[in-house]
């Protein structure tokens, strides 16, 4: 969950998001070291009176600054590709939910159940109850079981949308005429908020996403009450 004046990411709730946080720290360390080295070299160039106007070539230096960046790029690319393949992997999902983007709300369909579908609209600010979050609360939350692999099928009825939940490391484009898929698995129960992350019109900011992850027995009770 985000909070005011937050500088970092939201707390990771899924294994994928934990991997993304580790990759971010790994890449940030490399960028910090390179930036420090470049700033140090620039400061030396500005403060020293020594020059090398007679130097015509320096093959050793050229070899180093060709090979070293290649090694650094490999150190960044390998963990990035690993996470990319992990995000695309689908392992026997326990539940499949189809979400459709509309201007400007989301609709959900639990394909493993008959007639379990609903629309999810943002609750207007004037109707919020004490403790509820402005521009993030919806009238129908997406209730899902925790610690289970869930497949999300994402598409759109009209224009481009994007279904995103930061704390779960999810962001999937909703494209008209195309069905994209992603998987999620929450390691703990709770409410997780997201929003449409693709500009889709005048009310783009009013398309929140709320996932309610609960233990399996509570999910079964909820699904039975919705049928």
UniProtKB/Swiss-Prot annotation:
EC number: 7.1.1.9
Superkingdom, natural source: Eukaryota
Cofactor info, note text: Binds a dinuclear copper A center per subunit.
Gene Ontology CC terms: mitochondrial inner membrane; respiratory chain complex IV
EC main group: translocase
Membrane topology of this protein: Multi-pass membrane protein
Residues carrying Phosphotyrosine: 218
Side Mitochondrial intermembrane, residues: 1-14, 88-227
Residues given in the record as Cu cation A2 binding sites: 196, 198, 200, 204
Molecular function terms, GO-annotated: copper ion binding; cytochrome-c oxidase activity
UniProt keywords, alphabetically: Copper, Electron transport, Formylation, Magnesium, Membrane, Metal-binding, Mitochondrion, Mitochondrion inner membrane, Phosphoprotein, Respiratory chain, Translocase, Transmembrane, Transmembrane helix, Transport
Swiss-Prot/TrEMBL GO biological process terms: ATP synthesis coupled electron transport
Enzymatic reactions: 4 Fe(II)-[cytochrome c] + O2 + 8 H(+)(in) = 4 Fe(III)-[cytochrome c] + 2 H2O + 4 H(+)(out)
Cofactor(s) required, per the database record: Cu cation
Transmembrane segments: 15-45, 60-87
Subcellular location: Mitochondrion inner membrane
Annotated positions of the N-formylmethionine modification: 1
Binding site for Cu cation A1: 161, 196, 200, 207
Binding locations of Mg(2+): 198
Mitochondrial matrix side: 46-59
Subunit (UniProt): Component of the cytochrome c oxidase (complex IV, CIV), a multisubunit enzyme composed of 14 subunits. The complex is composed of a catalytic core of 3 subunits MT-CO1, MT-CO2 and MT-CO3, encoded in the mitochondrial DNA, and 11 supernumerary subunits COX4I1 (or COX4I2), COX5A, COX5B, COX6A2 (or COX6A1), COX6B1 (or COX6B2), COX6C, COX7A1 (or COX7A2), COX7B, COX7C, COX8B and NDUFA4, which are encoded in the nuclear genome.
General function of this protein: Component of the cytochrome c oxidase, the last enzyme in the mitochondrial electron transport chain which drives oxidative phosphorylation. The respiratory chain contains 3 multisubunit complexes succinate dehydrogenase (complex II, CII), ubiquinol-cytochrome c oxidoreductase (cytochrome b-c1 complex, complex III, CIII) and cytochrome c oxidase (complex IV, CIV), that cooperate to transfer electrons derived from NADH and succinate to molecular oxygen, creating an electrochemical gradient over the inner membrane that drives transmembrane transport and the ATP synthase.
Listed name of the protein: Cytochrome c oxidase subunit 2
Organism in which the protein naturally occurs: Bos taurus (Bovine)
